[in-house]
Amino acid sequence: IYKCRIKEDIEYEEELFLKKNYRQSREVVDFINSFCDRSNDYIRFLRDNIPTTIFMKTEAIYESGMNVNIVKVDDLDDQIHSVVWEIQHLINDCGFRPEDIAVVYPFNKKKLKNGKMIYFQYMLRKSLEDADIPYMYADDTVTNLTPKTGVTISNIYSIKSLSYKAIIICELEMLYNQKVSPEDQDYQINDFVGDLNKVYTAMTRVEDYLSIIASYDKESSDIFKLLID
């Protein structure tokens, strides 16, 4: 948020904001817009010299009838179990195909306090295989036109140019900047806003159904506070 903004260095005659959202359902858009409002207010609370709105809201034109779902779990095992349950529910009860669904998480691995690495991809893959759910990984070569062979597993960086009818976001605890205060330095505020943007990016990739599975709550994470308050 403290980096040079392009529009301040380029002369232009008109500034046009595209607000109509033809891709996402009203339920998803309303949830994201609330997140935008809370995030923008919190950023201004942290730094009152931010000149522009960071997160822009949109206007939905259709409804899906499916509310955004937030699932609170205790640990990583519960997260993976909940992810598999959500996928099975979407396929068996809601009529989605596996290729309509993506599971999105921040990074490829997680470091524990003892220094060991938990490979979330491996644990999720094994659980999907045990449940006979087909899956594929997203990378830089995957586009919306790429034939999908099952549920897409992706980190936030690979998902940013894709869209899916249903997205399950998990492992947001892997984000580094969970809490911040006005007393923190500018670079810490900037890093926190960067993590908010990762969450925002993941949510904007979904069309009809969004589920967020987390073990943190609003007391332990400002990110989750902005998501659920």
Name each model-derived stretch.
Residues 3-56:
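Conserved coupling/interface region of RecA-like P-loop/ASCE motor cores
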Residues 24, 28, 72-84:
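Phosphate/oxyanion-binding active-site loops and adjacent basic polyanion-contact surfaces
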Residues 77-84, 88-211, 216-229:
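Core RecA-like ATPase module of SF1/SF2 helicases and allied nucleic-acid translocases
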Residues 9-11, 60-64, 94-96:
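Short, flexible turn/loop "capping" segments at secondary-structure junctions
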Residues 56, 60-79:
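Glycine-rich phosphate-binding "P-loop"
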Residues 2, 32, 120-124:
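Generic structural signal for hydrophobic residues
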Residues 13-17, 67-70, 153:
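Conserved beta-strand scaffold positions in the cores of enzyme catalytic domains, especially
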Residues 18-23, 74, 214-218:
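Acidic carboxylate-rich catalytic motifs and surrounding loops in phosphoryl-/glycosyl-chemistry enzymes
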